[in-house]
Amino acid sequence: MRFNEQADGVIILDQTLLPGKEAYLTLTTAEEIWDAIYKLKVRGAPAIGVAAAYGIYVCARRIDTAEKSVFVNEFRKIKEYLAGSRPTAVNLVAALNRMERVLVAHPTLSVPEWKELLYKEAIAIREEDAAACRQIGENCLELLRPGMGILTHCNAGHLAVSEYGTALAPIYLGQERGYGFKVFADETRPLLQGARLTAYELSRAGVDVTLICDNMASVVMRKGWVHAVVVGCDRVAANGDVANKIGTSGVAILARHYKIPFYVLGPTSTIDGSCPDGDSIVIEERNPDEVTEMWYSRRMAPKDVKVYNPAFDITPHELITAIITEKGIFYKNNR
């Protein structure tokens, strides 16, 4: 993901087409950016934050006024619009708020000067995310041993962030250092991020990865093939509860049963200190067609059947062995 000045837009890889096709999109309007985030053309909490930062800068460039009050008013309208694209991932709103603070912190500057600072802030958000992800990987690698079997859910690799990933960062670093991890990737229904994205990027990197259906996690754990679970996070509440892709809490319950450490990896930007617990996190519900029709040549459920399709679930803090950020490893007793 990057800003292209010549195209005056944000360049993203359309993840909805992977692994069959690699297609890059140029996003130049608020509507295109909103659509890309909502339809998961760009996804992963950190990546959404970076996309929002670049996106609101692109939109701000197009606000054609020298009047600062008019500029701020239009900027805030765009900010609120983009913030509604995905309600669960805290990085989205955090990045947009950070971009707005550029204006608030420099009230005496002109509109062109504001625009220049917005560009620099968007770049800083991306660079900080990349550095954080690598450090997350280094911190987690301290807990892993060469040859371990590692299970992951959804996609928290370089497709979900600026570089390396969060949950996949230690796997990539381990691959560079000859650790020989054996990774089990849950397919992650209903949108198959594990099958389409995690298996895709790990196999391209030469990692030993085995794809399994979500309901097979218990089997590979029982066989002793899994020694650790690593997942990303979209929001961490103040008490340590975690919102992540639907199915994560089930994996955590299985890991607890089989006495396998369950690690949540994410940058500190995903921690929402204003959110007391998981029950306070708004869970996005998505189109029923994602369950009944997507990926199938024909509908696979009765036409009139009701569908419940939450995009995320809450993993209680008591099921989490440690939360690993760029700042360090945090266990239950030192939250």
From Swiss-Prot:
Name recorded for this polypeptide: Methylthioribose-1-phosphate isomerase
Catalytic residues identified in the record: D234
UniProt EC number: 5.3.1.23
Superkingdom: Bacteria
Keyword Secreted: no
The entry's keywords: Amino-acid biosynthesis, Isomerase, Methionine biosynthesis
GO biological process: L-methionine salvage from methylthioadenosine
InterPro entries for this protein: IF-2B-related, IF-M1Pi, IF_2B-like_C, Initiation_fac_2B_a/b/d, M1Pi_N, NagB/RpiA_transferase-like
